[in-house]
Amino acid sequence: MNKPLNFRFAVLSDLHVALPETVWQNLARIHLVEVGIPALEVALDRISEEDIDFLLVPGDLTQHGEAANHAWIAERFARLPYPVYVIPGNHDIPVLEANEQSIAADEFPGFYRMFGYEDTSRPYYTHEILPSVRLIGLNSNTFDVDGKQVGRMDESQLQWLRQTLSKSQAAGDELVMVMIHHNVLEHLPNQSTQGMGQRYMLENAAELLDILRAYNVKMVFTGHLHIQDVAYQDGIYDITTGSLISYPHPFRVFQYQTDRYNRHWLQMESHHVESVPGWENLKEQTRELMGDRGESYLLQLLTQAPLNLSEAKAKELVPSLRYFWTAVAEGDAVFNFSEFPEAAREYFESFGTTTAIDNRALLPMGEGRSHRRERLVSAAR
């Protein structure tokens, strides 16, 4: 990309919108779907002050694919003064065929004609959203022969992507941005190989990454994992944004800019919904909620590979991990578990970072440059 570019956009992810009549009553749930709509309204009010060119929403717009919730979101986004682009998350098309609760998978594009899906015949798309800026919205939800949902891109979509990127490259100097729900780079230690994190990654991420690198695509925006994290590998950033209904209730605002030396940068600022009616101290309340309801998750982390601790030993460590996952979700975490057995200490401290780039950063987008995570600029300029 040699052309100077300067534009501004926002990212909201994993909204899990649920109208009151569709809310599931589940006392074990750690995600607060009850605040989904008011939190979205607060975020949209804040974003309206940012003078953005467009908004990206990388999936999980609804609680569980309810037609009423899809219709509500489409109507709400239609009233916004800037373009919005969406893609489906696993919660948006949880079933192949419609049932009493959820829409059929192939119905999703029809709800979002105004938000990327002018062609409703397939669940992925591309648009030149600004001069010399192309967005590709991908679908990471497929179904196996038994009708089970799988986080994977099928071959027809991969072939379409190759053709789309080839045409973009032939047409001239375009900046390409990609949006997909499942993570394509690891945001947690060994996420691609260990069970509890593996399901949040695209099964055939390596194949997708090979295609993106072949066409010099640098930016991928994901969701699904409900954490704030920026991962980088061999020229590609996977910027995943946390969920609006769980701690820390984040959204992001970006400024893509070109400096006087024709170097390209992506400036990122993260913001949080701090309060909604009935939840005046929202972040602290949901932090405690996750602490109260997170024991079973922590026990799984401790008793499964790679630690494989006994249940008795795991229960001894759980109280010290009460706020572990909220710290991971907030991003830029630094951990010190010096009182833990060595293997457990090393494992849990590996979820932290030595460089704070998950929330506020200036990320280099220069051609052909290789920046390791620890060398990235952590202060916006």
Identify the meaning behind each predicted range.
Residues S13-P38, P94-Y117, D144-M153, S192-G197, ...:
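Acidic/histidine-rich helix-loop elements
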Residues M1-P4, G278-R381:
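Non-catalytic terminal accessory segments
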Residues D45-F54, R134, K148-Y237, F324, ...:
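His/acidic metal-ligating clusters that form di-metal
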Residues A18-E21, Q63-E66, N90-A98, F143-D146, ...:
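Active-site environment of divalent metal-dependent phosphoester hydrolases
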Residues N6-T22, S132-T142, M177-M179, Y237-G242, ...:
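Active-site-proximal beta-strand elements of phosphoester/diester hydrolases
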Residues M1-H70:
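N-terminal active-site segment of His-dependent metallophosphoesterases
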Residues A67, A71-S166, V253:
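Extended active-site neighborhood of metal-dependent phosphoesterases/phosphodiesterases
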Residues N2-A10, R122, T126-S140, G172, ...:
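Beta-strand-turn-beta hairpins that frame and shape the catalytic cleft
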